[in-house]
Regions:
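ATP-binding Walker
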Residues: 11
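P-loop (Walker A) phosphate-binding loop of NTP-binding proteins
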Residues: 8
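Short regulatory helix/loop adjacent to the ATP-binding pocket of P-loop NTPases
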Residues: 95-110, 125-126
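Short glycine-rich substrate-engagement loop in P-loop NTPases that contacts/grips substrate
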Residues: 26-54, 64
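Hydrophobic anchor at the beta1->P-loop junction of P-loop NTPases
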Residues: 5
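Structural recognition of the conserved hydrophobic beta-strand(s) that form the central parallel beta-sheet
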Residues: 56, 86-92, 113
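Interdomain hinge/linker elements that couple catalytic modules in large macromolecular machines
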Residues: 115-222
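Walker A/P-loop
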Residues: 14
Length: 222
């Protein structure tokens, strides 16, 4: 009845979800906006009015109390024969979405991860651009290298100054920027926590916590 589509911000989750929604009756609710959250001030009442539609809930981890309501709605719908394709949940914070949904929606939800574009998805002549620009669509498809670089700089700044603080951790943006840069230099190599700790002037446990945060935000794979 529910599918969770996870992936970092700007990877294309919303675009894909809206394309899916265009193929059938659906509603889209952005829970990052005040207006979107206001629409679900009484979630069971509102969503029960759209039982015949696909409900797309974007940034669903921003409204964790919703998962309990979804469980009740899914169970009610099952009794009326609505067994598949009811809710599409989008999230860019892996740990919150997985924990909240697994606790409330066990047996009612499937998970899919959407990653940036990889080398198997681009023509051979575009592989060099993929290596230099990365696989985020806005960066890869930018009209110039300068525009692509500016997009990536803005993307990093948004994560450091807005998204990470929203999740709770109080980490100096410049410290996390340096950590992120050092991780990039270790791409494909052995992770050396002690070396990073010395370079940043922090202890190994803090390095591990920073890495866990990056993994939870789907920005680093290990």
């Amino acid at each position: 009845p529910a599918v969770a589509l996870t992936g970092p911000r700007q990877v294309g989750k919303t675009t894909l979800a809206q394309e899916i929604g265009a193929t059938r009756p659906s509603i889209y609710i952005d829970l990052e906006s005040d207006a979107g959250r206001a629409r679900l001030s009484e979630p069971e009442l509102y969503l029960s009015q759209h039982e015949e539609k696909l409900v797309i809930l974007d940034e669903v981890h921003r409204m964790p109390e919703l998962f309990g309501n979804l469980r009740g709605l899914i169970d009610q719908g099952r009794r009326r024969g609505h067994r598949t394709g009811r809710f599409l949940l989008l999230g860019s914070a892996s740990i919150d979405l997985m924990r909240q949904s697994s606790e409330s929606l066990a047996g009612r939800i499937s998970y899919l991860e959407m990653t940036p574009i990889d080398a198997q998805e681009v023509p051979s002549q575009d592989v060099n651009a993929l290596w230099t620009r990365g696989g985020f669509p806005e960066s890869l498809l930018a009209p110039s290298d300068q525009t692509s670089l500016r997009w990536r700089q803005d993307f990093i700044r948004t994560y450091l100054e807005r998204d990470i603080p929203l999740l709770g951790p109080r980490i100096a943006a410049e410290t996390l920027r340096r950590f992120w840069t050092m991780l990039a230099h270790q791409q494909g190599g052995l992770f050396n926590a002690a070396e990073l700790a010395r370079a940043l002037g922090i202890d190994g446990k803090t390095v591990a916590a920073y890495l866990d945060l990056m993994v939870d935000l789907l920005l680093v794979r290990r």
